Amino acid sequence: MTLAGLSNSSTKSKSHLEVHELLDRFELLYDDVSELKDLRRAILDKDLSSIFRLSSAFAISSNGYLIDELRKSVLEENQYSILRLLEFYVNKKSLTTLTKTIKNFPKSNIKDAYSRGQLHSKKWLVSEVEKIGMHLGTVFLCAGWYGTLATMLFESEKIHLDKIRSFDIDPTCWQIAESINKPWVMDEWKFKATTQDIHSINFNEYTYKTLRSDKTERELFDKPNTVINTSCEHIENWQEWWNKIPNGKLCILQSNDYFELPEHINCVKDVSNFKSIAPMATYLYTGELMLGKYTRYMLIGIK
């Protein structure tokens, strides 16, 4: 069974997440929640010790009703019961919005956005930004796709920011990004996604048109403090784009050495190569993350 409730393989959408993928991704994202490992083992492996630990904990707490949800999860792999258990343990707004987004946008590529490589890369970024401890202010998220990084930044208890503006040239992205980040869209547009070529952005101060949920236009004005681009390998005319960013801006960049993909037109071979195409006055962090087929590189600094 899939998260979208589609059990027939011929009807599966690109956005569906199988039960094992759903459990794996949330265990990866929230590795500090030890019960998620028991939940995965109970549902996928029918591990008796895990089932016993979970059911015993429910029985002695005020959450005895969850025993029935656990039974349905283990015996039927009931998606709604699994989601209720995940909501109980994780207690994050993003779980509910992700579920609704998958149902409402069956043709989206949410499965790719929540791949292990994507989540590892973004979790790494969040971890290093937490260590640096700088207030991000207004964030311009370039090539923001479905805004999963925005969700992780908002949910971090150690990262402080004012708002996130996500820009992507793909017109199918903004509604999905806003669906996933709905709690922050509803909070006076603390999150807002816009269809925009990032080459046309003024990174000093930017007046631009965006769409409300009813698709009527509204003009916005923002002055970014932080520029994030985790898709540098996709950016055409890289130097032209990089030159648009003023000195003094906090920049967070990721690229990779996955040259084999034709859409990767701006890969780098190592951190030194990355620094040579994205020179900064001060580097606050440089590093790499091995991801099997390729290595991802990250630069955080003041241009």
Segment roles from a protein language model:
Residues D162-F167:
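Short beta-strand element of Class I
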Residues I169-T172:
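Conserved SAM/SAH-binding beta-strand->alpha-helix loop
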